[in-house]
Amino acid sequence: MDNVFDYEDIQLIPAKCIVESRSECDTSVTLGGHTFKLPVVPANMQTIIDETLAKKLAENGYFYIMHRFQPEARVNFIQDMHGSGLIASISVGVKEEEYAFIEELAATNLVPEFITIDIAHGHSNAVIRMIQHIKKHLPNSFVIAGNVGTPEAVRELENAGADATKVGIGPGKVCITKIKTGFGTGGWQLAALRWCAKAATKPIIADGGIRTHGDIAKSVRFGASMVMIGSLFAGHEESPGQTIEVEGKKVKEYFGSASEFQKGERKNVEGKKMFVEHKGSIKDTLIEMQQDLQSSISYAGGTKLDAIRNVDYVIVKNSIFNGDKVY
C-alpha cells in the first residue's frame, strides 16, 4: 500500500453547477430500506448518544445508532422506540450474553430495524459468528458489522451476512489504538475507505477521522453510504457528556469507547478523554452540515448526493489549509 492519503490531503474538483440555489440539492440517503435526511450518524459512544437524543434524531428523520454500554436497557429502548412509531437501532458486542440477548429478542418478537455489531477489531471469527447468529434469529434486522480496515475483512463480513460494514480502525480523535498498538487506519483513513469500498458490494459506513464538514463529502466521494462522526457531535446541549466550566468556559467531556473512563478500569485501554467546547444545540450543527453538503453537491455539478461520487480529485499533501487552523 503505497501512496496513501487522508482527508486533508485531498481536494475535490468542481464540475459545472446546474442548480439556481444550493437549497435545491438533496442530501438524503437510503439505508436498509429507510430514508434519512443526511448520510451522517453520530458515533455510538456514551458521550455522544443516549436514549433522549436517539429519539430526537429519529423523530427528525436522522439515522442514529444507540451505544451498547447499558445492555440491560436495550429491550425497553426497542419497545419505547417502536411504541413511538420510530425505528430501533441498537449495538451489540460479541460476548456470550449477547447471543442470549438476540435469542430473547427473537422469542419476544422484538425486531430492531438496525443492529450494529460494534467491536474495535471487527475482522474476527467472533464477529462472523455473531452476524450468522443474528441473521438466523432476526433475519429482518439490517446488520452493520465492524470495525474493519481491509478489503478482505469487508468481503468476509459481507459473505457472513452483514448488510453493511463499518470502516475505520483508530482514526478517531479520542482513539489511541494507533499509538498503543501500532495498528490502524489513522493518518490514511480516507485511502482505507476507498480501498474497502472498491471491494464492497453492500453499503460502507466510514467511521472516524472526520474533522470538517467537507470530510463528509470526501467520504461520500470515496465510497461511503453513511459517515459516522464523534468529535463534531460531542459537546452539544443534548450530548450526554457532563458539562463543566474550565477557566470560565463551558466544556463537555468526550471519551473513547475503549478508554478507562468507559470501562471503569485500566485494562486494554485504547481510548482517551478530552474536553470539547460547548457547542449549543445539535439541531444547528445538523442544519449547518446539511447546508454545507448541499453546497458540496452543487460544486459536484448535480442535485443529489450521488453526484459527489463522480467528481475528480487531486492529492495535495498537507497543504489544503494553507496554515489555517480549522480544528
From Swiss-Prot:
Q: Which CDD domains match?
A: IMPDH
EC supergroup of this enzyme: oxidoreductase
Report the Pfam families cross-referenced here: IMPDH
**Residues bound to NADP(+):** 204-227
The reply on keyword Cell wall biogenesis/degradation is: no
Q: Tell me its family.
A: Belongs to the IMPDH/GMPR family. GuaC type 2 subfamily.
The task this protein performs is described as: Catalyzes the irreversible NADPH-dependent deamination of GMP to IMP. It functions in the conversion of nucleobase, nucleoside and nucleotide derivatives of G to A nucleotides, and in maintaining the intracellular balance of A and G nucleotides.
Q: What is this protein called?
A: GMP reductase
Taxonomically, what lineage is the organism? Bacteria, Bacillati, Bacillota, Bacilli, Bacillales
